[in-house]
């Protein structure tokens, strides 16, 4: 059986099992499944945020508590219906997450997880010290949910609501990851520079994802309050947050299904320990914490992919060959830019200077790039090529001078804004997402050409725009000769093919200027020949190209014009000539040639 067929069978079996369980199971089992469903909602947000987005949170239980307390307080103190309390609870949770995220998500390294512990502790302490929330005693006699006259006070009656919401949350998350914002989410681990190169704002994507994960936790908190009809600070402290994170890790941080698997594993284990440990010792609570800590450490050492990692390997082993995919339905193409007439200046660098303290990396460099040509920026190691490249793409700030693109001064602009203007780039060290298909990697390049957001994507209201982006990605793959490998993983490609794939991603942005950072680095002779043929073909099709390179053989056969740098300065600019001609004249050009050959 092929993998899609296996997935369909597993999902159908799970839905049937969940549907009939309350008919045969007792109150304890149904209550446990309710807890698993609520835990799944929180863990699902953590899979998106931490596993896929790469932002670790040790404070997710605080968002569960904000929504739980908000709805509980409204319904007990003011008699507001829980259904009216839901939008209030989610709004308060979302605004809290927005404020916290704006303060903390720019932190890097271990500072972000530490900050989540800090605000998680603070919010839990706030719950325990507010008179309106009952301080450490909490709020009791919270009204149950009603659908018309039908009370959802019993475990069996609220069961179907919980699991319906879990199913909808899964569907939303699945749709989200298979969309324009989903590709940006899956690329967050590639770094902010990668997303900026396609016109996306990594901080904004991460912040929106942070709020989305908090809203899933808030939905779980609302259900928790009206299912248990009692709230107190202890279920929302940092220890509970670590438990939710353990659910995501145990199930598999990279898999949506891992949230359900991990929640079931952790809560079943927790209930088992609570039954067994009191029979063995009077310090059952301490041993339970030690047991979960040991499980966490073992998972990080031996099963970082979680249980779903093992399941995926098993499915890959036993699934049959993938089915041939039906061709996509044709839709109207994405809007294209009108390219400047051949020979029109599109990039102008004037007096560029970059200093790092007392070191002058780029010293008063000026040159132009005209439409329809291939320009090579060359020089020996340490000449300042990479620094110049970073100044052109606005990855680094300029000490003095100016860069104009299409007549507009882009000096000091954000890289993502320059990318949206039509300046696309590749990287010296390939930046592809290895676990994404070739098609998705290239579709990421078209990110700035549509405006689909999280909500529209999650509700699957982006079908037309998504087809347009995938159609454009397929067109670019066909253009570079990889169209028949669209659904392979990018990580399975050799280096030379990965570099060509990066060019396809840049082309998907419909650029006016394509800037390549040492595209021939690490390539074998035949791969360089193939790359050169591709670039010349693209130039003939109207693409303007600037190549930053130190491989003279590759550049001299390809470019229309050369700009030569050494020690941060421009030494020579003009039409390339043969090595023999350069060596025949004792001029500055001869000196440059010998420098490059050393």
Predicted regions and their residues:
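The feature captures the beta-strand-to-loop junction immediately N-terminal to the Walker
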Residues: 375-380
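Conserved ABC transporter NBD signature motif
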Residues: 401-408, 420-421
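Conserved ABC ATPase "signature" region
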Residues: 453-485, 512, 533-536
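Catalytic Walker B motif of ABC-type/P-loop ATPase nucleotide-binding domains
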Residues: 514-518
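Conserved small/polar residues in nucleotide/adenosyl-binding loops
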Residues: 580-587
